[in-house]
């Protein structure tokens, strides 16, 4: 069985992500041990909270360069919610901060007259073919909770949702690095399909 590490950097509910993979028959390890992460076949970067806190914690646990190194080595990486946002070059939550720089773009406040945070079920619109969306269709619904959104180039946009008048990247990716703004682990059967597709690419 492939070794998958859910990176523990004191951000978010890691157990719910672990349980979602277990329902697919895939065991995972929750760890911040550098050697364990280095030996992993794939990495999961969950996250709930603020961009600066996430980057501070990644730095505190000496994880920034290691994640960048594993990404450059072609190891599949899946970022979820805040974990997706820190994959980008820069974030503007509370203060301007550098991200991991694995994807092009920035993380900015959602600019809409709708209620913030964007919370609840919303539809996906598929922007381009990708192994990540192999089992998905337009209008599939997934669960979001966020106040900030990524901006990214079209070639890294896999699926998006709309909230009011705003187009929000929902699945982004380049090569072995994938991010989901929504929570697959809270998105029922559709979320299960996203994680299943990710596992099949490892």
Curated annotation (Swiss-Prot):
It catalyses: 5-[(5-phospho-1-deoxy-D-ribulos-1-ylimino)methylamino]-1-(5-phospho-beta-D-ribosyl)imidazole-4-carboxamide + L-glutamine = D-erythro-1-(imidazol-4-yl)glycerol 3-phosphate + 5-amino-1-(5-phospho-beta-D-ribosyl)imidazole-4-carboxamide + L-glutamate + H(+); L-glutamine + H2O = L-glutamate + NH4(+). The keyword Cytoplasm applies. The keyword Ubl conjugation does not apply. One of its GO terms (molecular function) is lyase activity. Its EC number is 4.3.2.10, 3.5.1.2. The active site is at 81 (nucleophile), 183, 185. GO terms for biological process: L-histidine biosynthetic process. Pathway: Amino-acid biosynthesis; L-histidine biosynthesis; L-histidine from 5-phospho-alpha-D-ribose 1-diphosphate: step 5/9. InterPro entries: Class_I_gatase-like, GATASE, Imidazole-glycPsynth_HisH. GO terms for cellular component: cytoplasm. Residues 3-202 form the Glutamine amidotransferase type-1 domain. Pfam families: GATase. CDD domains: GATase1_IGP_Synthase. SUPFAM superfamilies: Class I glutamine amidotransferase-like. It is found in: Cytoplasm. Keywords: Amino-acid biosynthesis, Cytoplasm, Glutamine amidotransferase, Histidine biosynthesis, Hydrolase, Lyase. PROSITE patterns: GATASE_TYPE_1. IGPS catalyzes the conversion of PRFAR and glutamine to IGP, AICAR and glutamate. The HisH subunit catalyzes the hydrolysis of glutamine to glutamate and ammonia as part of the synthesis of IGP and AICAR. The resulting ammonia molecule is channeled to the active site of HisF. Heterodimer of HisH and HisF. This is Imidazole glycerol phosphate synthase subunit HisH. The lineage of its organism: Bacteria, Bacillati, Bacillota, Bacilli, Lactobacillales.
């Amino acid at each position: 069985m492939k070794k998958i590490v859910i990176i523990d950097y004191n951000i978010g509910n890691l157990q719910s992500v672990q349980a979602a993979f277990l329902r697919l028959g895939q065991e995972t390890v929750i760890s911040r041990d550098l050697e364990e992460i280095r030996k992993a076949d794939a990495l999961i970067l969950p996250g709930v909270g603020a961009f600066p806190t996430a980057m501070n914690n990644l730095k505190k646990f000496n994880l920034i360069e290691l994640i960048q190194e594993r990404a450059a080595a072609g190891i599949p990486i899946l970022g979820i919610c805040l974990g997706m946002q820190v994959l980008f070059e820069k974030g503007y939550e509370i203060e301007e901060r550098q991200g991991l720089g694995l994807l092009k773009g920035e993380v900015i406040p959602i600019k809409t007259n709708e209620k913030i945070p964007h919370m609840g079920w919303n539809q996906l619109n598929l922007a381009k073919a990708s192994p990540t969306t192999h089992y998905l269709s337009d209008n599939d619904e997934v669960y979001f909770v966020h106040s900030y959104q990524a901006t990214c180039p079209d070639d890294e946009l896999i699926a998006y949702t709309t909230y009011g008048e705003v187009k929000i990247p929902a699945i982004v990716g380049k090569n072995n690095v994938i991010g989901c703004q929504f929570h697959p682990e809270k998105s029922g059967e559709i979320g299960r399909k996203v994680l299943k597709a990710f596992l099949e690419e490892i």
